[in-house]
Structures are given as C-alpha cells and as structure tokens.
Design a protein with these regions (language model features):
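Conserved N-terminal beta1-alpha1 strand-loop-helix module at the mouth
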Residues: 1-64, 69-82, 86-91
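P-loop/Walker A phosphate-binding loop and immediately adjacent motor/lid segment at beta-alpha junctions
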Residues: 4-14, 90-92, 137-153
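Structural preference for beta-strand elements that scaffold enzyme active sites
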Residues: 18-22, 60-63, 93-95, 120-122, ...
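Short, acidic/small-residue loops that bind anionic groups at enzyme active sites
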Residues: 86-93, 98, 123-125
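Conserved PLP phosphate-binding loop immediately N-terminal to the Schiff-base lysine helix
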Residues: 67-73, 93-107
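Conserved anion-binding
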Residues: 26-27, 35, 102-157
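Basic side chains
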Residues: 11, 63, 99-100, 152
Length: 157
C-alpha cells in the first residue's frame, strides 16, 4: 500500500483538482428535497450518498467534520461511517476532521477507531508529541495513513 501523501499526489498529478472537499453538514443548508421527513442523520446520509459521485469526479479527497455528525448521537455517528464508506467506495481519500489530541491509551484508541474509517485525520498538538505518536505509528511504512497537525487554523482569533 502506498503512503497517504503518495496516494493524494497521484490523484492530483493524474488530473484531479488539488481541492479537498470539506463535509460539514448543516441541516438548514440541505435541499428540502433530500429525504423529506426523515431524521437528521438519515437526511445527511442521503445527501452525501447522492453527492458523492459528483465529488469523486472532481476531487481526490473529502474531509468530513465529525462534530457535525456527532451532534445527532449514535445515528449521526452511523451517518459519518456511511459517508466515509461511500467516499472510499467511490475511490476518494477520506480525511477524518476529528481534531484529536489526547495521550496514551486514549490516543491509541482514537487512532485505531478513526483509521478504521479514514485514510488520514486531523490532530491538534496541544498535549505534545505523546498525543500524535499513536497516530504516527499508523503512518509508518506502507500503512497508507496520514495526519494533518493543526498549526494555524481558520479560527479568526
């Protein structure tokens, strides 16, 4: 298996846009025609299932923000899982926008869980290298995983 960086570069150099599509589902922004009357998580799942073919034609990767899914509880997490699976089924790389930053066995558990669904994840380094090590272990060799460490964010302050 090639590295995450090599997989992303291959797609971009092969002619796909270098843009990673952020998936931050907001119910008020979804078309009313998407699964009308369904629960929020079902609407989100339906929207991204229907949008994924178009995304896959133009972008090499998606970046679902887990917070927008988690707010709907277990059903929201299931929607996150379904969205990641659909993206991968379509040949897209998945960057889990999870912003994890714990240490020790907690970080190891996060790494195991998130790399089950995503090819790469976002991390924040506040707690130091110990918070990144379990994730970096998944990036060594031919494991095909990657991390994006938050250094400067789009936060206005």
């Amino acid at each position: 298996m090639q590295s995450f960086v090599a997989a992303l570069a291959e797609r971009v150099l092969g002619g796909q846009s270098p843009i990673v599509i952020g998936l931050d589902p907001r119910l008020d922004a979804l078309p009313t025609s998407v699964a009308p009357g369904a629960e929020p998580a079902a609407r989100i799942t339906a929207f991204y299932r229907d949008a994924m073919p178009a995304i896959a034609r133009h972008a090499p990767a998606v970046k679902p923000n887990i917070a927008f899914f988690e707010q709907y509880g277990a059903a929201g997490y299931a929607a996150y899982e379904a969205t990641c699976a659909e993206a991968r089924r379509r040949g897209l790389l998945v960057v889990g926008d999870v912003k994890r930053g714990d240490i020790g066995s907690t970080a190891e558990a996060y790494a195991e869980g998130h790399f089950r669904l995503a090819d790469a994840v976002t991390l924040h380094p506040y707690l130091g290298l110990d918070s990144a090590q379990p994730f970096l272990a998944h990036c060594r060799g031919d494991k095909g995983r990657g991390v994006f460490v938050l250094v400067r964010t789009s936060n206005p302050r």
